Amino acid sequence: MSEVQLRNNWKREEIESLFALPMNDLLFQAHSIHRQEFDPNEVQISRLLSIKTGACPEDCKYCPQSARYDTGLEKERLLAMETVLTEARSAKAAGASRFCMGAAWRNPKERDMPYLKTMVEEVKALGMETCMTLGMLSAEQANTLADAGLDYYNHNLDTSPEYYGDVITTRTYQSRLDTLSNVRASGMKVCSGGIVGMGEKATDRAGLIQQLANLDQHPDSVPINMLVKVEGTPFEKLDDLDPLEFVRTIAVARITMPKSRVRLSAGRENMSDELQAMCFFAGANSIFYGCKLLTTPNPEENDDMGLFRRLGLHPEQGVASTKEQDEAMLAKAAAQQDKKVSAFYDAGAL
């Protein structure tokens, strides 16, 4: 098979034609590319932790963390360092190779940057890859996080430029692209994807993929989320997306961004094992691991490992550690949970 050529000049019509392929033809093309670029049975595992929850000033209609919607979510301050490290140790011992930290902010405040920098350094010292999603970043903030050793920064485009205004009005599409440019210029790896099932049309799903695939450099990681409908948000009563359209989105992402990790992200809790298996065949090779994604449900770890065994999949190996080191990390995490200490960072005012 000839080497896959990377492209950054996809036309909307080309991507729409991929979406329109018969399912067998689409899956064959996507899986062939997937096998050429990756071990088809290896899945990268990340753990996602909300380090600051709720009270976000943005109006994203899908998000339970927006201060504008009554979703019953309790807001929390920025987590204390040891609370974060306890979660990171537990994640590594459970098999995660990357630890992702998310904060419900429009953008991080300058006063918090030194603390965030230290957080990255401390998690890196555990031997894990690191990722953060903190909202918009200036070039200076991106450089600060890069200097700390942050491996990935996540900032999703969410949907197509045309449908974007129906999803969020408090942040422009261009501001998202600017943040991705700042991240890439800093030397960090880019994690960017979107959400499907938000009432968009098929052409909008094609438009999202077009925007991602036509970035100067493809995102290193592309999370594809299925909308999780949360009571109290404007999108709580939307009709469900046909699951096969979700599989098509995964497949088209794999074809247009052949060397990127495509992450089967939010919404897995509501997916059957058979649907997830189709997504892995279509080119998904990364998941979030653990019972919660920021504030929404996710499959239990044992369920994921059981599915992996049934499908013959295996986790990507992170930095090697001994059984004794893993047991020590778990013991330290358990001991920390027993301590009567604040879970929150004193200076992290909402």
Curated annotation (Swiss-Prot):
Residues at which [4Fe-4S] cluster binds: 56, 60, 63
Function description: Catalyzes the conversion of dethiobiotin (DTB) to biotin by the insertion of a sulfur atom into dethiobiotin via a radical-based mechanism.
Protein species of origin: Shewanella halifaxensis (strain HAW-EB4)
Keyword Nucleus set for record: no
Top-level enzyme category: transferase
EC number per UniProt: 2.8.1.6
Keywords assigned: 2Fe-2S, 4Fe-4S, Biotin biosynthesis, Iron, Iron-sulfur, Metal-binding, S-adenosyl-L-methionine, Transferase
Protein name in the entry: Biotin synthase
InterPro entries per record: Aldolase_TIM (IPR013785), BATS_dom (IPR010722), Biotin_synth/BioAB (IPR002684), Biotin_synthase (IPR024177), Elp3/MiaA/NifB-like_rSAM (IPR006638), rSAM (IPR007197)
Cited HAMAP family: BioB (MF_01694)
